[in-house]
Amino acid sequence: MIPHKKNDSSFLSVPVSRVGSTQRLNQLASHGVATGSPNAYSSIPSTPSAYVSSSLNPTKGISAGPESSNQIITKEDRDAFGKLSIVEKVNEFEQNLTNLSFKVSSFKEDELASLIGKLIELNDIICSEIGELKKHRDLGILIKGLKDDQAHLDNTSKIILKELITYRNELKKLPRLPSNKNKASVFPSPNDSKVDVNEVLKYASKLSKFTKAPPTVSNLPFQIHPNNYVWPAEDALRRGMLAMSSIKVDDIINAELGEDTLEVKEEAIKKVEDNKVESITNSPPAERRGSFGERTGESRKQESQGALDLDLFDPDEEDFSD
């Protein structure tokens, strides 16, 4: 009968654990106390109660609070984060490191050199990618600031549009001024303020039942109408005309006589006066008056003939009168 051979525990390897040294010693001490023998030692440590997050975990240190708005929240964000080149390299590095630790723990020497070479290569790539992370971080901060500015501008533009809509509604309620087509000024000119007579008549017809005196009242010329009628009374019109004529006497006289006739008369008077002045200035000088004894008989005859001519009949005057 072959005797039972006891396994030598000295040749068993201890797998690599991520538990800290102090926590591991505490676990070993508690395990020895629980078995009751200080020499009862097991090379395989117990599984830790709490999961220790790896340094290569991409979601390590991510808080789900409202302050982490630009971090991984949804499944789509996690998938997009996993497709990044640096994350893929980190995952590949972790997988190769796990394979290397397993082969070392199981004393398998095959492919150890290739795994170590891959780890070195991946380490160099990750170091170069880490240098690019700073640029991506700065760009992310810039994008976040631009998004905040865009949100602020959107809110401001919405407030401005709401105020403009309220102002437009208030302006619609105000009465409109007549449009000035000739000038680009906002204020209306005096010519634009003229109202058509037909529009005034329509407005007056809306205010009163009659636009003129009814026939029953117009047939009574001697009746005194009260002042509260829509149409004016005859005595009121007469008083108004007399008052206007007493105020503007000169204007009425000029309108009756005509300004043209007065100007013609003034021009005729000026011409007559000018002719008199010219005749006086252009007349020859008067002859020297002789003495009483110097008169001849011829001059006496001419005077006597002139006196006789005054009493004679002149046929030219008769023809002119005809």
Swiss-Prot record:
Report the sequence similarity comment from the record: Belongs to the Mediator complex subunit 4 family.
* Complexes and interactors: Component of the Mediator complex.
Its name, as the record gives it, is Mediator of RNA polymerase II transcription subunit 4
Q: Where is the composition biased (Basic and acidic residues)?
A: 286-303
**Organism phylogeny:** Eukaryota, Fungi, Dikarya, Ascomycota, Saccharomycotina
Q: Where is this region: Disordered?
A: 274-322
Q: For bias kind Acidic residues, which ranges apply?
A: 311-322
The main place the protein resides is: nucleus
Q: Biological process GO terms, please? A: regulation of transcription by RNA polymerase II
Alphabetical UniProt keywords:
Activator, Nucleus, Transcription, Transcription regulation
Q: Please give the function described in this protein's UniProt entry.
A: Component of the Mediator complex, a coactivator involved in the regulated transcription of nearly all RNA polymerase II-dependent genes. Mediator functions as a bridge to convey information from gene-specific regulatory proteins to the basal RNA polymerase II transcription machinery. Mediator is recruited to promoters by direct interactions with regulatory proteins and serves as a scaffold for the assembly of a functional preinitiation complex with RNA polymerase II and the general transcription factors.
The record's subcellular locations are:
Nucleus
- Pfam families reported in the protein's UniProt record: Med4
**Organism (species):** Debaryomyces hansenii (strain ATCC 36239 / CBS 767 / BCRC 21394 / JCM 1990 / NBRC 0083 / IGC 2968)
GO cellular component terms attached to this protein's record: core mediator complex; mediator complex
